Amino acid sequence: MPHHYVLTLFGLLPVATNISTWWNFGSMLLTCLALQVLTGFFLAVHYTANINLAFSSIVHITRDVPYGWMMQNLHAIGASMFFICIYIHIARGLYYGSYLNKETWMSGITLLITLMATAFFGYVLPWGQMSFWAATVITNLLTAVPYLGTSLTTWLWGGFAINDPTLTRFFALHFILPFAIISLSSLHVILLHEEGSSNPLGTNPDIDKIPFHPYHSHKDLLLLTLMMMFLFIIVSFFPDIFNDPDNFSKANPLVTPQHIKPEWYFLFAYGILRSIPNKLGGALALVMSIMILFCTPFTHTAHLRPMTFRPLSQLMFWTLVSTFITITWAATKPVEPPFITISQVTSILYFTFFLSIPILGWVENKIMNAP
């Protein structure tokens, strides 16, 4: 009976009793995705992918379309909420050793890359001043690729500069990629339930499991309610908190903003890019800041799965968190001392965490095995 399978999938799913609130972010991400697809559809109905009309169509949505302002703000701030949740979700995975479930981790990082691409394309669509220049700077990094760089950039732009074909294809990609995210999310969940969730102790929870519903579903519902409350408070009272003032002006290719920067959720990677005074080196560091997450399942040497009982790894983990926040902050500042030095030091610390995982695991094993 189909009813029985639905119950098995969502209700009778066996879950460890001791998983904490940090395991709630998966369901929150699913809610964010549903919200983004829904609001995105209503925005796409009224949006015009043309460089002369794009900015005006956004103004039309916010002013003339009934509840258009709410859809636009929910979509923009919902993206920020999406990234807050995904960064916490990844941090939890790093702390509790969830990356040892290799297939789930790999599909998750692929999801992150797809999400970042989707968000980047979406940031270009309003065709504001910062949208245009952020697109110019980031896509121009392709020219750093030896031999193929210039051809790749021209192919992506659809011409010799960012123009109407660029906006059209970015809109098409921004519309289609969320469906790839939905497919990858399904794969991610299937692979996760193949092995089952980890837990704060890192032990095998098979002897002590409870049904997902009603126990964990109610716990998920609490945090979902809090997240939606927080989202609607920002949308209602602080709708421009994440916006760049430059983006309220229509794109002008003849006027360069004083300080070009992407959305806040890309600033850590952008800060790493800016800290290297070489185009190719910076582009490689930018790519590696995400790709290095693929390495974590293969560099784990500790006998214990989570960092719960590993003080040295904990110290490095919280250094990574503070480093991430510091790079993000430094990337909002102009390229001048002391911000250049701060970006360079924090970039080194960021990569040091991933390089130190195997060494720290080995040291902690020695300490625990000591008589």
UniProtKB/Swiss-Prot annotation:
Family matches, as InterPro entries: Cyt_b/b6_C, Cyt_b/b6_C_sf, Cyt_b/b6_N, Cytb/b6-like_sf, Cytochrome_b, Cytochrome_b_C_euk/bac, Cytochrome_b_N_euk/bac, Di-haem_cyt_TM
UniProt binding sites for a ubiquinone: 193
Topology with respect to the bilayer: Multi-pass membrane protein
Assigned keywords, A-Z: Electron transport, Heme, Iron, Membrane, Metal-binding, Mitochondrion, Mitochondrion inner membrane, Respiratory chain, Transmembrane, Transmembrane helix, Transport, Ubiquinone
GO biological process, alphabetically ordered: mitochondrial electron transport, ubiquinol to cytochrome c
Recorded family membership: Belongs to the cytochrome b family.
Name of this protein: Cytochrome b
Species, as recorded: Liasis mackloti savuensis
